[in-house]
Amino acid sequence: MSSRTVGSLRHRVRAAALQALFELDQTTHDLDSVVARISDDEMFSAEGRDFFARIVNGAWVNRQEIDDLIAKIAPSWPVHQMPGVDIAVLRIALFEILYDAAADKAPVKAVINEAVELAKHFGSDNSGRFVNGVLSTVVNKPESEE
């Protein structure tokens, strides 16, 4: 598969993951049923289904730790008051950067760029800048401060 095809697949998967995480956060729907339904609706390839399930499950399972990290980095913005799109985008990106151990893991810069693009497209006028600021702080933070 070409890098352009992989990139567009990952973009589609991340956009669908944003939808799934937003839905999970706003409803009482079951994780497995949301993942199955959206994955079926999107008609992903096997590779796309695997990536989708990995990032949605990973971001959702690790959301408390991810949210705690966001709260430390952006104390003026309580996580429970953040727009749902922003928090979903941050959960996806921070899962990929900090928790994803897959061999085909995307480079950090690619994850940040994609997160900023998703935030700009689906979020408010300030979402892209906010997401970029949080992710840049995480990536540039010395390990001794974590």
From Swiss-Prot:
GO molecular function, one term: RNA binding
GO annotations of cellular component type: cytosol
UniProt cross-references to Pfam families, sorted A to Z: NusB
Record-annotated disulphide pairs: none
Source taxon at top rank: Bacteria
One example of a Gene Ontology biological process annotation: DNA-templated transcription termination
Keywords from the UniProt entry: RNA-binding, Transcription, Transcription antitermination, Transcription regulation
Family membership: Belongs to the NusB family.
NCBIfam families: nusB
Xref: HAMAP family: NusB
Biological function: Involved in transcription antitermination. Required for transcription of ribosomal RNA (rRNA) genes. Binds specifically to the boxA antiterminator sequence of the ribosomal RNA (rrn) operons.
Protein name: Transcription antitermination protein NusB
Native organism taxonomy: Bacteria, Bacillati, Chloroflexota, Chloroflexia, Herpetosiphonales
